[in-house]
Structures are given as C-alpha cells and as structure tokens.
C-alpha cells in the first residue's frame, strides 16, 4: 500500500479515487493534485512507480489535511462558542446553525426524541 500523509491509500483504486480517502481531499482537489503531480488520474495506485507516489506526496503536502484540518475546524467552532455569538450558541445547544427550522425537523442535530417519561 502507498502511504500518503500518514494514510494507507487503497492500491486497487484509481489514483484520484484513492486520494479522496484522505480527510480534506475531495474529488476536485484529488484531480487537481494528480494533474499538478503529472500523474495520470486513471492509473491505479498499484501501477504507480516510486517517483509518481513521491510527486503525489509533495502535492498533498501543500494542503491542510487530516489532523491539522480537523484541529482547525474544531478551533473555529470553539472560537464561535467562546465569543457567545448566535452561531456559537447554536453549536453549544446542539441545534442547527444555518437557519434551518427546528419546530418539526432537525432530528439529526437534536438527537432522538425524548418521551414524557424521560423528562
């Protein structure tokens, strides 16, 4: 298996699809990384030579991904909660942040319904 950014990417998949298994790299970014590294995106990872894998590593290193990205997102949410702004309060209360209605929906964000016995 090829190891890029501390992640073992699947060898049986095409290069661009395998790159999407890294947190922070989606389809568009994976294709642009393959183009910048000069790697044909439709070639499977097991068929890449060491130079191509190293070129992919170099290109992936230019982006904020994996642990750094997760930490950055968590710090952004924590900053909103510390500020006490509307979005921070919604995060703190576990409610939808982006203006969705909550009277009837938002079950994913609010969690399962509690019956009268558990209140």
From Swiss-Prot:
Residues 92-119 are annotated as: Disordered. It holds the Pfam family Ribosomal_S13. One of its GO terms (biological process) is translation. The keyword Secreted does not apply. The keyword rRNA processing does not apply. One of its GO terms (molecular function) is tRNA binding. InterPro entries: Rbsml_uS13_C, Ribosomal_uS13, Ribosomal_uS13-like_H2TH, Ribosomal_uS13_bac-type, Ribosomal_uS13_CS. GO terms for cellular component: cytosol; small ribosomal subunit. Keywords: Ribonucleoprotein, Ribosomal protein, RNA-binding, rRNA-binding, tRNA-binding. NCBIfam families: uS13_bact (TIGR03631). Located at the top of the head of the 30S subunit, it contacts several helices of the 16S rRNA. In the 70S ribosome it contacts the 23S rRNA (bridge B1a) and protein L5 of the 50S subunit (bridge B1b), connecting the 2 subunits; these bridges are implicated in subunit movement. Contacts the tRNAs in the A and P-sites. Belongs to the universal ribosomal protein uS13 family. Part of the 30S ribosomal subunit. Forms a loose heterodimer with protein S19. Forms two bridges to the 50S subunit in the 70S ribosome. This is Small ribosomal subunit protein uS13. The gene is rpsM.
